[in-house]
């Protein structure tokens, strides 16, 4: 089998990492490359494992995303939607298994399918009550809110032949650069508009116009949608007890799309300018300095190799 090539690409998450800390960006996309097969004690392997770890809040969000993906993928194939109780039980078992494995730091023994928590890796003090509160409010609470929401009712009413995608990693090209995207759920309504839904498990309520616009640009290429035929939907799942998930619809007008193109163009240029060989996508660690924001370092999975513990 041919060796994998570390080709240059862009995504909103890659852009955010580059903005937050260029050293963390290097570690994630260059320093860790090949770590899936590197010797256990090598620096490359360490960076590879660490980049796979997440904070407990990120982990809880991924558990929720995976649960909803499982629910809708199965419904798309079989026509049946699991009841809430069954999804809760499946999710509980999976979360417990992942938590137990992370606590034992078994992620160091895995080749590539790595799930682990930075709190366990760095021995951060988190009480049992805090872990329980996280599960009940973010994981279980999000699933309850989703099942009570008008969003799920709209999905139920939409014929499956108008379901366009369920959290599928895909890509498109912008001025020659591959752009990665994963829309949580996409469907076409009766009027032909394409709705792109994004599940949110954080507390922030601000609209990420770049993310919405990049989804819209992708949809226009993927499904040949008219400029005014895309509607972004941010679905906030973490709510007060008993409240349904809330959807905020965001229109992607031409001004927003052009602002996104400008940002992407500039971001890609900055990333490529930092490379020692742009054609071969080769980077040197010394060209990617560490952030001076020590508070950000305290939350970063790379704090040990960076000497910022």
Regions found by a protein language model. Give the residues of each.
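An acidic intrinsically disordered interaction segment
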Residues: 15-39, 173-186, 264-269
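Metal-dependent nuclease catalytic regions and adjoining charged, substrate-binding loops involved
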Residues: 221-309
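Nuclease catalytic cores
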Residues: 15-31, 40-76, 96, 132-136, ...
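Short, solvent-exposed segments of well-ordered alpha helices
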Residues: 9, 51-58, 202, 206, ...
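Non-catalytic protein-protein interaction segments used by genome-maintenance enzymes to assemble
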Residues: 36-39, 160-220
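Active-site-proximal structural scaffolding
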Residues: 8, 178, 208-212, 293, ...
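A non-catalytic, helix-rich entry segment at domain boundaries
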Residues: 63, 67-164
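Short amphipathic alpha-helical segments and their helix-coil junctions
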Residues: 4-7, 28-51, 191-197, 274-283
